[in-house]
Amino acid sequence: PGRYMHLSEPRTCFMTGKLLQIPASVTPWIRFPLFWLSCHNLPMWLYQLLVNRVLKHDGYFVTYFHPWEFYPLGEHPEFKMPFIIRNHSGKGMEERLDVLIRKLKEKGYAFMTYSEFAQIKLAELNKPDEK
């Protein structure tokens, strides 16, 4: 988990030279990562609570999922995948993501691609200071 917290870097979008870095969201203060593995293993109510805190604090939430997470890994012991990866994989992950999206849409949050998000953030970061 420590490798996902990047304690020496900003929690939110930042520039490295001319490159916009868009890190996956972590909670304010303790920097708990809210990426795919958290969605697999946290109770859904807790994951949603943490996502809502990030949205209130940062104004946006960034996460990602891998295609294999939607495959029923639990049905294949020969893969020898750890429980934290098999947990809620396949249909379970599909249902969790569906619930998350529906709840966020009910609250009026917009969804967009990384490219769309990058365009908005780059415009904000490149806006001249108004004084």
Residues covered by each model-derived region:
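Active-site-adjacent pocket scaffolds in enzyme catalytic domains
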Residues: 1-64
